[in-house]
Amino acid sequence: MTNIIRQFLRQEAAGGIILIVAAIIALIMANTPAQGIYHAFLNLPVMVKVSSLEIAKPLLLWINDGLMAIFFLVVGLEVKRELMQGSLAGRDKAVFPAIAALGGMLAPALIYLMFNGADEVTRQGWAIPAATDIAFALGVMALLGNRVPTSLKVFLLALAIIDDLGVIVIIALFYTHEVSMAALGVAAASIAVLAFMNWRGVGKTSLYMIVGLVLWVAILKSGVHATLAGVIIGFMIPLNVKKGPSPSETLEHELHPWVAFLILPLFAFANAGVSLQGVSLSGLTSLLPVGIAAGLFIGKPLGIFTFSLLAVKLGIARLPEGIGFKQVFAVSVLCGIGFTMSIFIASLAFGDADVVLSTYSRLGILIGSTTAAVVGYGLLRMSLPRVR
């Protein structure tokens, strides 16, 4: 395993633990007298004005639209690296986690729709349980230390990266509403400039960031979710240049600690603070939270494990070396930790306008993700040999 992947896994695992702490603090603040401070912080008005261009949003939306674009930039860099020279490079390496990820997105969505398909409003949240929080999942896996084989860590990493790619496609296709053609035109021109820079082998990441900022503003104004700008920029930055170190790997190395230790924990803090005031047992057992929790805890392992088993039995793919189906099942349960990614999709599906839907969708995510984390940890602990 390369040094960059080792470092990635260490940072994701440590970041996952900080993420959990941030979410717990948010839940405590949202349900104590500190809730006033918590909500005042999230609603803090922030305005950026350059000439006639003005963007004014509360801090919560700057976190969700701005900082999360940086997260998706790192995702774009990771996916490109893994596709070209990492754990997804070549058909043999990519097929098994790709098929597993496909099952892990289809089954949770179908289970969610079994509960919510008849309701026109809640049906929009079908993609909520399709996501996996890689930082949280790796954080739980890290609790078992060196008992976890490298091949299993790389499998989870590859699976989660493909899952992220699927989520990006879902956001672009299904969670984009009113579109401004003028802003899309500026976005298209920005992408063309980035593509030309990549083709010419421009290695200065600062130039990509300048054009990328224009792209982010254009996509934000277009009605398409602004985080997609991050993915596009990540794919456009070259992995290799004729002289000097890799621009893509250098930028990923610089940004990853900020994402793991600041951006994702801040996102969790800003979005996990669900007030339990007014929450009832009947509401908690209603179709929305039950569908989300079932999609995460039942749908994820069902889809990942079934598709993995079929792929191997049909000869389409083979198990990675050093991994058995017991470990695959344990990892498939861990992938039911949707947390930040599921909360992100819930915010796109329901927004913050409907407090009831927002509250119960987040509670469903927290229940499903927590159950998946506890059970997944237990199964993984039982399936791995003890290190003496």
Swiss-Prot record:
Gene Ontology biological process terms, A to Z: regulation of pH
Transmembrane segments: 13-33, 36-56, 59-79, 95-115, 125-145, 154-174, 179-199, 213-233, 259-279, 287-307, 328-348, 363-383
Subcellular location as annotated: Cell inner membrane
UniProt catalytic activity: Na(+)(in) + 2 H(+)(out) = Na(+)(out) + 2 H(+)(in)
Keyword field contains Transport: yes
Disulfide-bond pairs as recorded: none
Signal peptide: none
A single Gene Ontology CC term: plasma membrane
Gene Ontology molecular functions: sodium:proton antiporter activity
Sorted UniProt keywords: Antiport, Cell inner membrane, Cell membrane, Ion transport, Membrane, Sodium, Sodium transport, Transmembrane, Transmembrane helix, Transport
Pfam families reported for this sequence: Na_H_antiport_1 (PF06965)
Membrane topology: Multi-pass membrane protein
Cited function: Na(+)/H(+) antiporter that extrudes sodium in exchange for external protons.
Family membership noted in the UniProt record: Belongs to the NhaA Na(+)/H(+) (TC 2.A.33) antiporter family.
Name by which UniProt lists this protein: Na(+)/H(+) antiporter NhaA
